[in-house]
Amino acid sequence: MKRLASCLMAIGVLAGGASQASGIRVAGVDHVGINVPDLKQAEAFFGSAFGCEPVTRIGPFQLDPAASADAAGFAPRADSVTIAMLRCAEGSNIELFEYRNPHGNKDMPRAEDIGASHIAFYTDDIGGAVSYLKANGITVLGEPVKMTSGDTEGETWVHFRSPWGSDMELVSYPNGKGYERRSSLRLWNPKHPGQ
């Protein structure tokens, strides 16, 4: 019986790349949602910098600040919300929310704050991408960092601030990453989305 279980486990490991032992079976990340102060500015930025294209737009929806929490547990503090969905190459979509909100917190979360997040865009030409951002008035936070050892060896990354102040990242690993030499399991790669 132990031998049968071992054989079945080996077949399972050999049969597929990323497997899910339990839980919800997902095909991937559908979208990343970002709150922005100006929807048109954000659409223009993602379009000109990364080639993202607007696909859908809904709203503005009037919100009732006196209403009780909705099914998602949110009690609206904003007056209205408009939502746009962008298609970004072969990766995840980006969902943009523009809340009209005189009461909301305008401070950006810092990297160490709970709830802080960032989105990373893959490019084979990180130097060219950094030059483009700088030429277009985008604040790049330091110089690209090249990882020279460990699981992320071969990866280069740099963070930048969007026009509205969100932390974002450029990442590049055209020749792969260090972990690939020791593991058959692969992280999703936008250059090879089906692998």
Where are these regions (language model features)?
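A short acidic/small-residue loop/turn micro-motif
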Residues: 62, 101, 174-176
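Positively charged n-region of N-terminal signal peptides that target proteins for export
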Residues: 1-4
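Core segments of cupin and vicinal oxygen chelate
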Residues: 35-91, 128, 135, 148-153, ...
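Short consensus segments that form the blades of beta-propeller domains
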Residues: 23, 74-75, 108-111
